Design a protein with these regions (language model features):
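Mature catalytic domains of secreted/periplasmic carbohydrate-active enzymes
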Residues: 2-494
Length: 494
């Protein structure tokens, strides 16, 4: 493996930072990680999938992989629309990726209006095209396509709006992501070398095999480390998100080194950082547990995050998006927050740099609800129980596409200050609700609520509800309330 002087010096700097601590590249040392307070309090963030794959805008963000798999819809669409893959390959979308209407300030203002507190633009997806200025490859948005440091512009705009800038790297999967292009006449063929867009295009493994061959090489892993540390140093993100292939055995030493480097940089900056990971890629307690398009069925004693998309069928913009409703997204947010989690909601901008009108409308609807009910979400903590009600929920990844059919008996709880927030997931037409977890009990040995409620209100309404408590629960009458969204009852405790 040949490295230039910049790369050699950078690796030496990485080693120096890791050696200096306070974090070192062992799980024992990384276990000293503590979730940053800002993340625990923020609760709601925005994810952004925007890149070359936004140009074809067909099916989903895996277009660059699937356009090279014979028989796939993307393969057939590509040949019908652009020509054969040897004449028009994925790289040929770069001149069409102009981002001519991209305004980072407009995006950041929209996210602020949506009630988000932090934003994760994707720095590099599986396709290998960097959305930032890089010294490690020419295949980036600064030198090609829009000729802009889109990630840098977003960082400035996001922070100017008072939001927290984070970012994600999906580079690990690039090891194999474009490999099917070698199976027929296309523009992906040897020789390939480090720095090329299509390098290394190795055979795609079974994703469940964490020791798959061909084993990622030292050259590839070094490149992954350098790219990640470049993002860390150039953009100083408050948190990093990694997608799924970093759980492969080959990544472990490099992953630990990167984590130590990043956490040490955070210590130098005077603001702790965090890594979001899936599939036990990292040792539990050394970062933030992530669940893609799903959640836990029960409250967790640790800080975690669910990442999902505004559309059910894609993370990037396409012309066939199947959108979730604002109600469905708000139900997910409330349920996740009650279980000690955060929700990271993805939107996919168009290749011209605009965010679709439907996305904007949904985000503003969410923001309107949060403007009224945010005290039950932001900086809240789980109550002694997260929920009551009859509806059973699915848990795990890829389980959130269908809206859960909640009833007026399904309630979620959060707490903050002297208040318990009872969030009714489906408000009944007659305005009558019973919160059974706030019943009166004569047996103080039972581990239930035994406090005194001095006042009850409905967030967003000036009129006070009628209420009383007995052994069956807290009975609320609020016929003046009408909403398709979750309704928050605020119970102030003596």
């Amino acid at each position: 493996m040949q490295l230039n002087s910049f790369e050699k010096e950078y690796l030496e700097e990485i080693d120096r930072v890791v050696a200096a601590g306070p974090f070192h590249d062992t799980w024992e040392s990384l276990a000293a990680f503590e979730p940053p307070r800002w993340l625990r309090e923020a609760k709601f963030g925005i994810f952004l999938h925007w890149g070359l794959y936004s140009v074809p805008a067909f099916n989903n963000e895996w277009y660059p992989r699937n356009m090279y798999i014979q028989g796939k819809p993307e393969y057939l669409h590509h040949r019908e629309t652009y020509g054969t893959q040897d004449k028009f390959g994925y790289k040929d979308f770069i001149p069409q990726f102009k981002a001519e209407k991209f305004d980072a300030n407009e995006w950041a203002e929209l996210f602020r209006q949506a009630g988000a507190k932090y934003v994760f633009p994707v720095a590099e997806h599986h396709d290998g095209f960097q959305m930032y200025r890089s010294s490690l490859s020419h295949w980036n948005a600064w030198e090609m396509g829009p000729h802009r440091d889109t990630l840098g512009e977003l960082k400035l705009a996001i922070e100017e709006k008072g939001l927290t800038f984070c970012t994600s790297s999906h580079r690990a999967e690039h090891w194999f992501f474009l490999s099917h292009g070698k199976e027929f006449a296309s523009d992906i063929h040897e020789p390939l070398q480090r720095g090329d867009l299509y390098w290394p295009s190795m055979p795609e493994p079974n994703p469940e095999d964490l020791q798959s061959k061909p084993y990622p090489t030292e050259e590839y892993l070094t490149d992954w480390l350098l790219r990640t540390c470049e993002i860390i140093d150039r953009y100083q993100p408050a948190a990093l998100y990694f997608d799924w292939w970093i759980q492969h055995e080959a990544f472990k030493p490099w992953l630990r080194k990167m984590a130590a480097y990043y956490y040490n940089r955070g210590a130098q900056w005077g603001r702790p950082t965090a890594i979001c990971y899936k599939h036990d890629s990292m040792m539990f307690g050394s970062g933030i547990v992530e669940v893609e398009r799903g959640k836990f069925a029960q409250a967790q004693p640790f800080c975690w995050q669910s990442d999902t998309a505004i559309a059910k069928n894609s993370w990037c913009y396409t012309d066939t998006l199947d959108y979730k409703t604002p109600r469905q997204i708000l139900l997910e947010l409330v349920d996740i927050v009650s279980k000690n989690g955060n929700l990271l909601l993805n939107v996919g901008p168009k290749s011209d740099g605009t965010i679709p009108e439907t996305d904007q409308k949904i985000l503003r609807e969410i923001g309107g609800w949060l403007h009224t009910n945010g005290e039950a979400i932001y900086s809240s903590r789980p109550w002694r129980k997260p929920a009551e009600g009859p509806t059973k929920e699915a848990q795990g990844q890829f389980t959130d596409n269908q809206e859960t059919p909640y009833t007026p008996e399904d309630i979620r709880f959060t707490v903050q200050g002297n208040s318990i927030y009872c969030i009714v997931l489906r408000w009944p037409e007659d305005g009558r609700v019973t919160v059974r977890s706030l019943s009166v009990s004569d047996d103080q040995n039972v581990p239930e609520f035994h406090g005194l409620i001095k006042e009850l209100s409905v967030l967003g309404y000036a009129e006070a509800p009628q209420w009383n408590r007995d052994k069956d629960g807290l009975h609320v009458q609020a016929p003046f309330v009408s909403s398709e969204y979750p309704v928050v009852l605020k119970a102030e405790v003596l």
